């Protein structure tokens, strides 16, 4: 990554972290993927049960492999029914997620189809750890909503066997398709419980 952009991300991340802290959430900056994995493991005690809500970021940085290789109870939802997976996630010590977008003052936006991910972010698991790339930082809530709907959702639609306008055109049409993956919108602006929500901002 260009050194100038890296410096910009470092400065921006500190502002996001301040915003998160003002909202009773914790923020961290990781200069690369390895640092992000190290920070995540510092937040997850050995022996913890860990669930995940379709977080490709956790796979991409190598966190899931580290958990599977370590002394952790990683809940593999691919081996469970949707209902079993949801109940296990609610009861987990740690829930891993990404965010579709985050504002520069620490407000997160997430869109969900089945709603298992946003429901676990809102309540249930004792701790939620977000892995968020700096490319997801937006100037304000309006920009964050636009990113979630016009960038994140159309990209995520490519991962699933769905028939939605955004999958074929690459942008949001505010559709009501039976296959829509935009059923629930969750805006996380404050955490009722201190030390529950942790956000790792990754310079990647």
Feature map (PLM): residue ranges:
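Glycine- and acidic-residue-enriched helix-capping/strand-helix junction motifs
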Residues: 1-9
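Conserved phosphate- and dinucleotide-binding cores of soluble alpha/beta proteins
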Residues: 90-204
